[in-house]
Structure formats: C-alpha cells, structure tokens
A protein has these predicted regions:
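Domain-level signature for proteins that mediate thiol-based redox and metal-cofactor handling
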Residues: 2-100
C-alpha cells in the first residue's frame, strides 16, 4: 500500500509560520474564548500551543512559552481574563480529550 503524504507537509514553512502567528494573535485578542472552552471543543488551547512550540525546539521554559502565546505572563492573563470553569465545561473538556 503506497504511503500517502499529508498535503499540509507540502505547505511552505514561511506560509505556515504566518498562519500560526495569525492564529496566536487572533487568540490574544479573543480573551472571551476561554482555554477550557477551546479544550472542550477542539482538544487544544493556548497552553497546548505553548507546549507545541517547546516540542518544536523553542528554547524558553514553560512560562516563557506561555507568555509568548498569551501575549503576557500566564499569571497576569489568568488574573485578567480566565473565568472559573463550570462542571459542564470540565466534563466537555474531559470528553474532548478522550478523542485526542
């Protein structure tokens, strides 16, 4: 059986980088999109993006990576924008994570 190539792998890195930066900047502006809701819908959030850039070779530590993605230190972002997760949000996140 021939191995199939994911067309995404053919996307030039400069274009992929531009799209990634646009996504991050979009999420920086959309504070109403809570991480818990992103996790519940898609199985990833801003913190996951921070983990992924570290997995890809970013030299900063976890806090540096999260500050880069959030646009500010994580503690500041949490204090300014994060709301308390409801039991429903937590259940949705748990169900979503099982699909990853």
């Amino acid at each position: 059986m021939p191995e199939t190539v994911d067309p995404l792998d053919k996307l030039p890195d400069d274009i992929a980088a531009q799209a990634f930066r646009r996504l991050v900047r979009h999420l920086r502006k959309r504070h109403d999109a809570q991480n818990i809701d992103l996790m519940g819908l898609s199985g990833f959030c801003r913190n996951c993006l921070a983990d992924w850039i570290r997995d890809a070779g970013y030299d900063g530590d976890k806090g540096d990576a999260r500050a880069l993605i959030h646009g500010m230190p994580m503690d500041e972002w949490k204090a300014r924008f994060q709301t308390e997760a409801t039991p429903e949000q937590l259940a949705r996140m748990e169900a979503s994570m099982k699909k990853n």
